[in-house]
Amino acid sequence: QQSSAASDVYKRQLLHSAIVVEKRETLKSWTILLAILAFGFSLIGTFIVRSGVLTSVHAFANDPERGMFILIILGIFMGGALTLFSFRSSAMEARGVFSMVSRETALVSNNVLLAVSAFVVFFGTIWPLVAELFFDRKLSVGPPFFNAAFTPFMILLGLILPVGSNLPWKRANILNSSKKLIFVFILSICLAGLIWAIQTGKSLIGPVGVFLGAWIVMGTMLDLFSKLGRSISLKRLIVLPRADFGKFFAHSGLGITMFAIAALTSWEKEDIRVVPVGGSWKIAAYELKLNSVENVRGPNYFSTMGVIAVSKDGQLLTVLRPEKRNYPVAQMPTTEAAIDYR
């Protein structure tokens, strides 16, 4: 997962840099380098997953010979591309000039934050291999490291994104461009304060996620509506470039994702316990009872299934049937969660 995330981050950088090249004819060398790195990290992710150098449930079809073949391809492609880039990068002269306060600068800041975060992800992924190879130590880098190292860059990115989206190209006045965002900023702060007041516990993660989500989504909406002018009509909406809609949906999706991650981290509840057959326990306003544990034979698997009755105020709501499956041919156990959406 982490190896593919690093490649995805470089692809996002490449997309933003390509926009600058298209609009302003600058950052040409940087864009070519990002294209090389994005492809290279895709190969690195393939090598990690296929070669078996890392032990993980996500590593499949392990084959050291295939891994060596991928490593050779990686060396040839990346070595050749970076060598050619080092000799020819000076020929890609940038024509566009921009000031320190402009949309170009905001996109460069976005690239820097994403580049550092991608390096952090790659470092955390590859460090157990380095530690075992050179220091003979077995290490495991888990979620605490990635959360602590990755989160600050994502918060900075979320703060910059609406401001950068509303800046004009080439040259901008930060005060004039930010005036229209003041109301959005205040409203986002108020929403975060409301969540802080009504939440159980005093975790900052949830309110910060609400603030960033509201700030990004509403700031992106403001950028879209500002292109429509004062008279918002269906006709003007239809003639807007598709790139504006693409930016709106992509940035709004990022804001919603930040909120969802923060909400899950802050407000999820996990209850691990041993329950005998016929035993019951309570979670919030719900009462759960383990009615039975059954052995089930499927078309290509054997399963141990729990039958759990869920009730509220003495009334049965639903029956959940989570399973622990084992596939004899693949020798692969899986967990099938039981989810009720009401």
What residue spans do the PLM features occupy?
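Solvent-exposed, non-transmembrane regions of integral membrane proteins
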Residues: 4-342
